[in-house]
Amino acid sequence: MSSNKIIIANWKQNGSLRTLQSLTSQIIKALKLKSISHSVVLLPPYVYLPILAKKVTSAKTLRNLSIGVQNVSAFSDGAYTGEVSFEMCKDFR
Protein backbone atom coordinates (compact mmCIF):
# COMPACT_ATOMS: atom_id res chain seq x y z
CA MET A 1 0.00 0.00 0.00
CA SER A 2 1.43 3.35 -1.10
CA SER A 3 0.57 6.58 0.64
CA ASN A 4 1.30 10.08 -0.56
CA LYS A 5 2.59 12.05 2.40
CA ILE A 6 1.91 15.75 2.86
CA ILE A 7 4.49 17.96 4.55
CA ILE A 8 2.82 21.04 6.05
CA ALA A 9 4.92 24.00 7.17
CA ASN A 10 2.66 26.05 9.46
CA TRP A 11 4.81 29.03 10.34
CA LYS A 12 2.31 30.34 12.88
CA GLN A 13 3.49 33.77 14.10
CA ASN A 14 7.16 33.10 13.40
CA GLY A 15 9.51 34.94 11.08
CA SER A 16 9.78 38.31 9.41
CA LEU A 17 8.98 38.84 5.73
CA ARG A 18 12.69 38.69 4.88
CA THR A 19 13.15 35.45 6.83
CA LEU A 20 10.11 33.76 5.28
CA GLN A 21 11.02 34.89 1.75
CA SER A 22 14.44 33.34 2.24
CA LEU A 23 12.99 30.15 3.70
CA THR A 24 10.50 29.87 0.82
CA SER A 25 13.32 30.31 -1.70
CA GLN A 26 15.36 27.61 0.05
CA ILE A 27 12.39 25.21 -0.01
CA ILE A 28 11.80 25.89 -3.71
CA LYS A 29 15.49 25.31 -4.46
CA ALA A 30 15.55 22.07 -2.44
CA LEU A 31 12.43 20.75 -4.18
CA LYS A 32 13.96 21.50 -7.59
CA LEU A 33 17.26 19.80 -6.71
CA LYS A 34 15.88 16.72 -4.99
CA SER A 35 13.34 14.24 -6.22
CA ILE A 36 10.71 14.62 -3.51
CA SER A 37 7.41 12.95 -4.26
CA HIS A 38 5.62 14.26 -1.17
CA SER A 39 3.34 17.29 -1.36
CA VAL A 40 4.59 20.38 0.48
CA VAL A 41 2.18 23.04 1.73
CA LEU A 42 3.40 26.36 3.15
CA LEU A 43 1.13 28.15 5.64
CA PRO A 44 2.59 31.61 6.30
CA PRO A 45 1.04 34.31 8.50
CA TYR A 46 -1.81 36.11 6.70
CA VAL A 47 0.10 39.39 6.31
CA TYR A 48 2.75 37.65 4.17
CA LEU A 49 0.40 35.42 2.19
CA PRO A 50 0.11 37.54 -1.00
CA ILE A 51 3.88 38.03 -1.30
CA LEU A 52 4.79 34.41 -0.61
CA ALA A 53 1.93 33.10 -2.77
CA LYS A 54 3.42 35.02 -5.70
CA LYS A 55 6.82 33.43 -5.03
CA VAL A 56 5.30 29.93 -4.85
CA THR A 57 3.18 30.33 -7.99
CA SER A 58 6.19 31.64 -9.91
CA ALA A 59 7.86 28.25 -9.28
CA LYS A 60 5.52 26.70 -11.86
CA THR A 61 7.57 23.57 -12.41
CA LEU A 62 6.89 22.44 -8.84
CA ARG A 63 3.53 20.70 -8.89
CA ASN A 64 4.05 19.36 -5.37
CA LEU A 65 4.38 22.80 -3.73
CA SER A 66 1.37 24.85 -2.69
CA ILE A 67 0.43 27.58 -0.26
CA GLY A 68 -2.52 27.90 2.08
CA VAL A 69 -3.94 29.67 5.09
CA GLN A 70 -3.45 28.71 8.73
CA ASN A 71 -6.94 29.31 10.00
CA VAL A 72 -10.43 30.02 8.65
CA SER A 73 -13.27 31.44 10.71
CA ALA A 74 -16.33 29.33 11.35
CA PHE A 75 -18.40 32.40 10.45
CA SER A 76 -18.94 33.64 6.89
CA ASP A 77 -19.14 37.28 7.96
CA GLY A 78 -19.83 39.48 10.94
CA ALA A 79 -18.15 41.47 13.68
CA TYR A 80 -15.52 38.89 14.63
CA THR A 81 -12.32 40.80 15.35
CA GLY A 82 -9.24 39.25 13.80
CA GLU A 83 -11.14 36.47 12.01
CA VAL A 84 -10.76 35.70 8.30
CA SER A 85 -13.57 34.02 6.38
CA PHE A 86 -13.31 31.34 3.69
CA GLU A 87 -14.63 33.86 1.14
CA MET A 88 -11.82 36.28 2.04
CA CYS A 89 -9.24 33.51 1.66
CA LYS A 90 -10.54 32.65 -1.81
CA ASP A 91 -9.48 36.14 -2.93
CA PHE A 92 -5.84 35.05 -2.64
CA ARG A 93 -6.19 32.64 -5.57
What are these regions (language model features)?
Residues 1-84:
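Conserved N-terminal beta1-alpha1 strand-loop-helix module at the mouth
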Residues 82, 90-93:
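Non-catalytic positions within long, well-ordered alpha-helices that form the structural scaffold/packing
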Residues 87:
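Surface-exposed charge patches
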